[in-house]
């Protein structure tokens, strides 16, 4: 399990992970690593939270929130944000399914993708600022938001099909078992109960689960399945929805 954790950390983040820590792990085994996603999200969110807490007293809440969001983007190399932009470019092109998938594969940023990035990043800065002004424990909130975003993404993997013939998302989509899904969601719920005392965190997680489940069904109907881009979009939107649900 430790090898899977380090392999997944290297896969979905830009944190330096020595190759020997995940050596001997076959790429086809990566689907089992979905259960580590909430823990990896918690780690990344905690780093972003530490940046916010460290800068808050020095430059104020809005700028601290801005640098926190920037840190989270840098930690993943914009991996999930790129998926969000590509998904919006394809979906909102209002073309045929095959053409949508072609647009999503295009490396160029379109208008809809650009607008999606602006909206999500700005919304995160504003919501983080508002939560801090309301006295929310930000280190825990940010750690849990990133854990929730990655944990609920399993809903776009279990019993879904891959919309393309090949790609990185094919490692997870349709390969995750019911047991792995339950463990992933259960671990995410446990983290919510621990990090956010009371029912506030769990309630926010339930809202996030419902929203991402609906998103997955809509994407399935539109694209005929999921892709790595839609997983990235689900993670980014999951983080934002969880933070909004905490308000």
Swiss-Prot record:
Please tell me which top-level EC class this enzyme sits in: transferase
Identification of the protein by name: Adenosylcobinamide-GDP ribazoletransferase
A Pfam family it matches: CobS
State the similarity comment.
Belongs to the CobS family.
Alphabetic keyword roster: Cell inner membrane, Cell membrane, Cobalamin biosynthesis, Magnesium, Membrane, Transferase, Transmembrane, Transmembrane helix
Record's keyword annotation contains Mitochondrion:
no
Organism domain of life: Bacteria
The Swiss-Prot or TrEMBL record lists the needed cofactor(s) as: Mg(2+)
Membrane-protein topology: Multi-pass membrane protein
For this protein, the record's InterPro entries field holds: CobS
Q: Could you list the residue ranges that cross the membrane?
A: 34-54, 59-79, 113-133, 138-158, 171-193, 194-214
GO process terms (BP) = cobalamin biosynthetic process
Task: State the pathway, as annotated in the record.
Answer: Cofactor biosynthesis; adenosylcobalamin biosynthesis; adenosylcobalamin from cob(II)yrinate a,c-diamide: step 7/7
GO terms for MF: adenosylcobinamide-GDP ribazoletransferase activity; cobalamin 5'-phosphate synthase activity
Q: Which reaction does it catalyse?
A: alpha-ribazole + adenosylcob(III)inamide-GDP = adenosylcob(III)alamin + GMP + H(+); alpha-ribazole 5'-phosphate + adenosylcob(III)inamide-GDP = adenosylcob(III)alamin 5'-phosphate + GMP + H(+)
Q: Give EC number(s), comma-separated.
A: 2.7.8.26
UniProt keyword DNA-binding, yes or no: no
Give GO cellular component annotations, separated by semicolons.
Answer: plasma membrane
Protein function: Joins adenosylcobinamide-GDP and alpha-ribazole to generate adenosylcobalamin (Ado-cobalamin). Also synthesizes adenosylcobalamin 5'-phosphate from adenosylcobinamide-GDP and alpha-ribazole 5'-phosphate.
